[in-house]
Amino acid sequence: MKTSELRQKFLKFFETKGHTVVRSSSLVPHDDPTLLFTNAGMNQFKDVFLGFDKRPYSRATTAQKCVRAGGKHNDLENVGYTARHHTFFEMMGNFSFGDYFKRDAIHFAWEFLTSPEWLNIPKDKLLATVYAEDDEAYNIWLNEIGMPSERIVRIGDNKGAKYVSDNFWQMGDTGPCGPCSEIFYDHGEEIWGGIPGSPEEDGDRWIEIWNCVFMQFNRDEQGNMNPLPKPSVDTGMGLERMAAVMQHVHSNYEIDLFQDLLKAVARETGAAFSMDEPSLKVIADHIRSCSFLIADGVLPSNEGRGYVLRRIIRRAVRHGYKLGQSKPFFHKLVADLVKEMGGAYPELKEKQAQIEEALKNEESRFAQTLETGMALLENALAKGGKTLDGEIIFKLYDTYGFPYDLTADICRERNIELDEAGFEREMEAQRARARAAQSFKANAQLPYDGQDTEFKGYSERQTESKVLALYKDGEQVNELNEGDSGAVVIDFTPFYAESGGQVGDVGYIFSSENRFEVRDTQKIKAAVFGQFGVQTSGRLKVGDSVTAKVDDEIRNANMRNHSATHLMHKALRDVLGGHVEQKGSLVTAESTRFDISHPQAVTAEEIAEVERRVNEAVLANVAVNAAIMSMEDAQKTGAMMLFGEKYGEEVRVLQMGGFSTELCGGTHVSRTGDIGLFKIISEGGIAAGVRRIEAITGLNALKWAQEQERLVKDIIAETKAQTEKDVLAKIQAGAAHAKALEKELARAKAELAVHAGAKLLDDAKDLGAAKLVAAQIEADAAALREIVTDLTGKSDNAVILLAAVNDGKVSLCAGVSKPLTGKVKAGDLVKFAAEQVGGKGGGRPDLAQAGGTDAGKLPEMLVSVESWLCQKLS
């Protein structure tokens, strides 16, 4: 049964039981600040369970997309190395909001799992757990379902406190809670592991496939369990786990959905396809979480959800690099994912281009530092030692963009510990530097009770002023000496204080005897401006007469960008629609950054039209006029106002001919022609329904255009293209040739491995009942598997154990010719071998792989195999 069929079957079953099929909620939880990402089916119903929300249905069923990466629920480091850890997964669920309870929940689960009409899983492959005190659930399983008592396991308070158990669920320290009953599937005795509650429960034999949570109580602040008037049910079935059961495979990565993605990863990286290669699994998993997160409005950034996404992308790119792919490849997998899951989740198809673009941009950005960062890391690791220094970890993070867990991932592969304390010291030092740099911002709430500042900056760039107050280290002082950082308050100021998205002015406050460099201007109070900076010469005292002068070049650049922002705002509303609202802005001398409400990516055509309209207004060179008027009069002009902004009784209205009318207190050009060339250089989403646009003006825009022109010419020269139009064809032809060469190289390596294996079989030790090959060779894990498979296929009585050492780690592969597997099992052999070299392993009777950490024990281990085999054969 395909994964897509299983998903539909589940929803259909519960629909026949009176459940409303509710579509998956976004991965970005709305109105729940406690969650980084949606990580369970019940998240979208949390307020229903708490009684804050009512739905027109009392039974629901969902296929919920979930992400567990970052925050409390973080599976990132295990992904690729286990059979069932994922950053993205689908949770199938059925829910009762005060409708049915334990009896129906258990009966529904059992019917769906075991009925011939639905999944038809053999009943003797299933086991149930219940909370130790939940006699009601126990009796339903025993007397109504008919499950033998030895297959019903009571789980008590196994987490160190009352009602703290694997089988007792709670939303928080207080609130809804209750026992749960889990259903486990037996993957077979050839897999190591024991039943829940046993010492071997962490093994992979018994796997949880279903969890019924019975919200039965409300825990108060005293810890009392008060029965809920309307008990509810929340159940979950992991789609990938159940697909593995239905497809008779052990690992989630062996199901149809992942097999197709793994093949796509191998295709795009040029790597040999192997189920024993963790990097293939990492990338196949990560393309799912990254694509779905971007589809739901998350974009790579340095904070919050965006940073988690960035970490996942960079981990995938690093694993591609590990497989030998140094070119951007990750974004090319989106099309394969859309083919697999676009039917169930149409947002993937709708936003495919946006997802590909976001991934490609992040790949390209990281590619610039990945190789250099890896070289730094390799040099550090080559020096030996069991721990990577915290300074190196920080440098990788700060300079080369390596998230901490990416470095940890690499070190884990080499059995190297991380100096976490040293890294934290470096991080704290960086935070301290940042605090020092920001220590003179207005948010320091400097004490001041003197006269207000009179702002002259609309019409004057220089004023003759008097020093009213001085500050150092957040305290009021009488003087500032050379080298002191501090703040200055003067009676008349030409410096604009940061407000409305425009940064504060910079410049100088000086006299014949001293000079204070103004690096920022902030409001200390509503009408009191503080000039923050450094006393570069002399001594400045309260009461001094000084000259205050704004840096003209930076002020002019700020004005150009601020005026351009107004024109862009109007053009965006005209092109995209009246729903566009300003959500934030940052106007600096370098650029203008403008955030707007818009549900989707702004297309290239729309951006071009916005640019055309703004530049048209610039060429018109109309006057820019500002007037102070009452709010009532301002409204009559049709001036644009920001939703939620608080305005006074009098406001400043800025008009740019017939192009734009808006309330604004910032500084602006005299005529629109002063803006110069206007160019949008980036557009992207920063939150669900919010887009960020960055634009540049004047000489900055000209410089950008010239750089683009130089880049195109360099590409033409590098590709030896005749014209710009020929470049793409040249690049595509080169890429196709390189890909063909990579495939040819992979085939050649495989052939060499097979030839090397044939020599091993010729030299095998004949033990009568079996021919033994136990040897160390030079090969990677994939090649080991291929050689062993080839050798056991050429003989009726071969027992093969091959070992290799790569990057300090031991790889083992065991194989047994099928006629011999009744006496000798490859899984037993590889387990015996792995234990001697510091590892673990297991697998099928005919083929099994494992790893180890102690390469020094290899010779001794290989010698011991003969006596082990003789014992098995006797």
From Swiss-Prot:
Reaction it catalyzes: tRNA(Ala) + L-alanine + ATP = L-alanyl-tRNA(Ala) + AMP + diphosphate
Alphabetized UniProt keyword annotations: Aminoacyl-tRNA synthetase, ATP-binding, Cytoplasm, Ligase, Metal-binding, Nucleotide-binding, Protein biosynthesis, RNA-binding, tRNA-binding, Zinc
One Pfam family hit: tRNA_SAD
SMART domains, per database record: tRNA_SAD (SM00863)
Molecular function terms from GO: alanine-tRNA ligase activity; aminoacyl-tRNA deacylase activity; ATP binding; tRNA binding; zinc ion binding
Main location: cytoplasm
Annotated positions binding Zn(2+): 562, 566, 664, 668
Any one biological process term the GO annotation gives: negative regulation of DNA-templated transcription
Secreted is among the record's keywords: no
EC code: 6.1.1.7
Entry's cofactor comment: Binds 1 zinc ion per subunit.
PROSITE patterns linked to this entry: AA_TRNA_LIGASE_II_ALA
Gene Ontology cellular component list: cytosol
InterPro entries linked to this entry: aa-tRNA-synth_II/BPL/LPL, Ala-tRNA-lgiase_IIc, Ala-tRNA-ligase_IIc_anticod-bd, Ala-tRNA-synth_IIc_core, Ala-tRNA-synth_IIc_N, Ala-tRNA_ligase, Ala_tRNA_ligase_euk/bac, DHHA1_dom
UniProt cofactor(s): Zn(2+)
Protein's cellular compartments: Cytoplasm
UniProt remark on domains: Consists of three domains; the N-terminal catalytic domain, the editing domain and the C-terminal C-Ala domain. The editing domain removes incorrectly charged amino acids, while the C-Ala domain, along with tRNA(Ala), serves as a bridge to cooperatively bring together the editing and aminoacylation centers thus stimulating deacylation of misacylated tRNAs.
Its job: Catalyzes the attachment of alanine to tRNA(Ala) in a two-step reaction: alanine is first activated by ATP to form Ala-AMP and then transferred to the acceptor end of tRNA(Ala). Also edits incorrectly charged Ser-tRNA(Ala) and Gly-tRNA(Ala) via its editing domain.
Family: Belongs to the class-II aminoacyl-tRNA synthetase family.
Protein name: Alanine--tRNA ligase
The species this protein was found in: Neisseria meningitidis serogroup A / serotype 4A (strain DSM 15465 / Z2491)
Protein encoded by which gene: alaS
